[in-house]
Amino acid sequence: MKYIQSTDNKYIKLVKSLQHGKYRQKYSMFFDEGIKNIKLSLRSNYKMDFVLIREDFKDTSLIKKLEERLGKDNILVLNEEIFTSISDTVNSQGIIAVFDMKKNEDIKSDKLLILDRIQDPGNIGTIIRTAESFSINTIFYTKGTADVFSPKVVRATMGSIYFVNFVKLEDISKLKSEGYKIYASCLENAISSKSAFTDEKMALILGNESVGISEDLINQSDKKIKIDMTGNAQSLNVATAGAILIYEMCK
C-alpha cells in the first residue's frame, strides 16, 4: 500500500475533480464510497482503477480482495484530514474506489426503463436499485436527466449501478423498430397499469418530477398508463411510482 501525505497528490486531485460532472465526462471515470457498494462492485465487470482508504480502515478481508484485484500499489492510504477533504459523505466508512465508466453495451433485457429528465439524485438511485432488483439491466435516459454517475446517485443505488447498462436515448423510434412497445406513465387519457403490461418487449417511461414525460415521448408511446389510487393523493413520488410500475411490468 502507498501512503499519501499531501492534498497536492495527483490521485487526490483526480477524485476531487470527479465530484463535478464535466470532469467525470472528460476522464470517463467516477467514484463510489462505502463498504457494501465496493464489495458488490467486485462482482461486476466494471474496471476499478484504484482505492483510497482512511488510515483507520479495519476491514482487512476487503483490503486483501482489493490487493488481489488491483495490486498493493493501487491501494492508497490517507490520514483523516486528507480523506475527509475528498469524501462526499458526512459519516464515511473510510473507503473510496475509482472506476472507469463502462461503454454502452447491447440491450440484454426484454424490459427496459427510460428516464425522462428526472432530476433528483435520490430518485434516480432508487429507481436504478429497484430496476436491477427485477433484472432490468438496461436503462435509457434523455437529455436533461441528472448524471447517473454523480456521487449521490451512485451511493443511492446501493451497488446496483454496477449491474446496469446506461444508454442515452437519441431516438425512441429505434426501440420501436426493435419490437419494443412503449409505455408512458401519465395521468391523462391513461389506462390502469394493473393489466396494461401485456407485451413481450416493453419499455417504461418515467418522467420529470414536476412536469412529467415530454409531450413528444407521450405522443410516440403505445400505451399511456396510470396507477390506480383510492386515497386523496393526486400523484406519487416518481421513485415510488416507478417501483409500483416496475413490479407490475415484471410480475
Regions found by a protein language model. Name each.
Residues Y3-Q5, L76-N79, V164-D171:
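Short acidic-hydrophobic, aromatic-tinged amphipathic segments that line or gate anion-handling sites
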Residues T60-L70, L217:
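Short, aromatic/basic amphipathic alpha-helical patches
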Residues I75-I96:
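Glycine/small-residue-rich loop that forms an oxyanion/phosphate-binding "nest" at active or ligand-binding sites
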Residues V98, D106-N189:
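RNA substrate-binding interface of SAM-dependent RNA methyltransferases
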Residues T130-F134, T145, V153-Y162, E215-K251:
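Structured adenosyl-cofactor binding patch, chiefly the S-adenosyl-L-methionine
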Residues S185-A233:
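Active-site/ligand-binding-proximal alpha/beta "capping" segment
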